[in-house]
Amino acid sequence: MPQEQTLERPGVAVEASAHAEHRITFAPAGVTLACAPGQSVLETALGAGYFPKHSCRRGECHACCTPIKSGSVSYPEGFVPEGVPEGYCLTCMARPQGQVEIEAPEVSSVPGRRVVRAGARVLSTERVSHDVTVVQLQVPRNAGFDFSAGQYCDVLLRDGNRRSYSMANAPDGSGVIEWHVRALPKGRFSPHVYKALKPGDMLRVEGPFGGFALSTSDKPVILLASGTGYAPIAALLKTHAEVLKARGAALYWGCRRLEDLYAFEEARAWGAGGDHLRFIPVLSEHGRNWSGRSGFVHEAVAQDFPDMSGMEVYACGNPLMVDAARATFTREHALPNEAFFSDAFITVMSHPRAAP
């Protein structure tokens, strides 16, 4: 087991004991779980069927940044939780030391859907842009692969690696899942999707994972996506369209060029329902004929909403965009930290989100 890191800061253990009994309580549900030595808060929760908010599982995206109500945590040697406010922890990396209680309103008092591993048959592939393929898969209905809008699953590769993709469709119990796969030249999986994957092929998948989900609040919503970060946002829209209209929602989708908005007509249809659900495309590289918004997508949001104190933001896609949006909105536009929900797509290393 790696040696624990000594960190002199509130809410972080100064010294770890391998023999102590480690327990984590999720408030306000009151769920208490025993943690094995060296196991993270998130690993413990997922293993028991609970889904705290999370995304990358590597300490990079900060989607799992959670307030510590009492107790302390430690981190693996060499890991520094940069940018984490005092009194908070990254549950994907944090290890409870003794008794720890964290604030996680998304955790219910009853375990949620279990993680399963199953074969999945390719139903269809559709090239929707120069580098994005929409893949539909059929998981056996009796496999118990029950997901919620906003979650993702892993495809298990023959070399032992895995790649993660968000479901872009609404869950309906049919076992059908849809991915939006962007091809990267040096990727382990996406080039195969782009060049060779065909209907009838079999893949091995594991999931569902992720705590990215629409809250039960009645606050207005900003849906923020870059690139294929549109996929989990589309799942939220398809599942909760009426709720989002009732709350008031604005969908901002940023891409480089117009042709990169691979589901433009679908997104525009969402925004055709009047002021209660608007669609604002934003291009960073546009031609002369583009009359819409330009620049960075999170900056377009900031221009339109100087005060976000009474709103919620759901951001998906490039981690640089997600991080910039979080920093800008919380520091300069009064968005509460707990009102920023994210699913950052990390493209390399052990647990990538929407990886190549």
PLM region spans:
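Reductase modules of NAD(P)H-dependent flavoproteins
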Residues: 1-100, 248-356
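Short, surface-exposed secondary-structure boundary micro-motifs
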Residues: 69-72, 105-107, 158, 208
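Short, structured interface segments
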Residues: 88-112, 201-203
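Ferredoxin-reductase
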Residues: 114-202, 220, 255-257, 282-286
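Short, conserved phosphate/pyrophosphate- and ester-handling motifs at nucleotide-, phospho-/glycolipid
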Residues: 150, 229, 318
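A short, basic/flexible loop-to-alpha-helix module at the beginning of a structural domain
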Residues: 206-219
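Histidine-anchored nucleotide/phosphate-binding helix
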Residues: 234-242
